Regions:
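An N-terminal hydrophobic leader/cap segment in hydrolases
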Residues: 11-81
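Serine-hydrolase catalytic core
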Residues: 68-69, 75, 79-83, 89-90, ...
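Short beta-strand element of the alpha/beta-hydrolase
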Residues: 100-108
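The serine-hydrolase catalytic nucleophile loop
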Residues: 109-123, 136
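Conserved alpha/beta-hydrolase
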Residues: 124-143
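Alpha/beta-hydrolase active-site loop
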Residues: 147-168
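Alpha/beta-hydrolase fold nucleophile elbow
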Residues: 168-180
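Hydrolase active-site cap/lid region
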Residues: 188-252
Length: 253
């Protein structure tokens, strides 16, 4: 009996230690994922590519860097709106003479408008598109403590679409465009009461839900289990955003 009790206590202690470790690791990863200022962990060399699973291409990156510099420096109007929850959100308006359409562009996770759209901005300009490049909440000059992975940004997308129609009218068709998390943002906004002038959505490399992308990163990129970690991540998400990580999906929208 004493031996059995000892084995049981040892097993329970090991399980508790394992659970505590998963809890701690998950909280750190959620800070990396959601915080405006990520922990030092993400700033270490190679950590970002490990999280995203991206394989760097130096030639492509060099071209993107130069195009990003040119886009950021190009003359344009800095604009702003207030989100539904009272945050100051920044945007960059690039009008096109004799425009045929308007694009509202949303960048991705821990990125920037002039980086994600650097290499396509020239094409949009040549195709006579006026473009509003949005700075997503909790990034760059937009307020907010937490990145919402589309759960909160979808409402910001609606607000920006309404701002465009209020300022410029509804004569031109509006297209919502997004890359990565920005792609998820515009897709999740599809079931909201968007202005009738919104005629289409362009989404590149979007994921289906925060829960799905966190599970993918944990299993495929970091090679760690997600059963208990997923439950903890959802609790953190609910506490910070007041919405569950799987309550909205691009497939449902």
């Amino acid at each position: 009996m004493k031996k059995a009790a000892k084995i049981t206590i040892t097993a329970l202690s090991a399980a508790a230690a394992c659970g505590a470790a998963i809890y701690g690791v998950t909280h750190v990863l959620m800070d990396v994922a959601m915080n405006r200022q990520p922990p030092r962990l993400r700033k270490k060399k190679g950590s970002a590519s490990r999280l995203t699973g991206e394989t760097p291409n130096e030639g492509f990156r060099a071209a993107q860097k130069e195009a990003s510099r040119q886009l950021a420096a190009a003359p344009h109007e800095v604009v702003a709106i207030q989100s539904r929850d009272g945050l100051h959100l920044a945007g960059h308006w690039f009008p096109c003479p004799d425009a045929e359409r308007i694009i509202i562009a949303f960048h991705g996770w821990h990125s920037a408008w002039h980086w994600d759209f650097a290499l396509i901005s020239g094409f949009w300009r040549r195709e006579r598109c006026s473009v509003l490049y949005v700075e997503q909440r909790a990034q760059q000059n937009s307020e907010g403590d937490y990145i919402g992975f589309g759960l909160t940004e979808r409402e910001d997308c609606l607000a920006w679409a309404r701002w465009v129609t209020e300022r410029f009218g509804t004569a031109l068709p509006i297209y919502l465009a997004g890359v990565s998390m920005g792609g998820t943002t515009v897709l999740m906004a599809a079931d909201l009461p968007l202005p009738e002038a919104v005629r289409g959505i362009i989404a590149d490399s979007a994921y289906t839900s925060p829960h799905a992308i966190w599970q993918h990163v944990a299993r495929k990129n970091l090679h760690i289990p997600f059963v208990l970690g997923g439950w903890i991540a959802d609790r953190v998400c609910r506490r910070r955003l007041s919405v569950g990580s799987d309550e909205c999906s691009t497939l449902d929208s």
